[in-house]
Amino acid sequence: MGARYNSDMASSNDYLVYILDLLQEVPLIHYRKMMGEYLLYQDNVLFGGLYDNRFLVKTTPSLAEEGLKQMLPYPGAKPMYLIDAEDKTEVARLVMKVVNDLR
């Protein structure tokens, strides 16, 4: 479960474009830039964000069984799950599990 934070750079616009491409199979995605990072929403549900060029989503019961690595988005924050899949269908499946838990 080793949650760690070890970076001090903001997320790049290129990384945002890459992640938005990965999220094409998830409907109603939008984002908000905040303090050099990006918050990600699905139909107005905040489910995660981009932190130091890492795609992190909130920890929810449905994702606990997925074996995802936990990381800190920034010092003092709660751990979040790192999404490192590159398959759009798999990314959509994981994101919708989080969103459904948060609704």
Task: Enumerate the language-model features and the residues they cover.
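Charge-dense, helix-prone N-terminal extensions
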Residues: 1-103
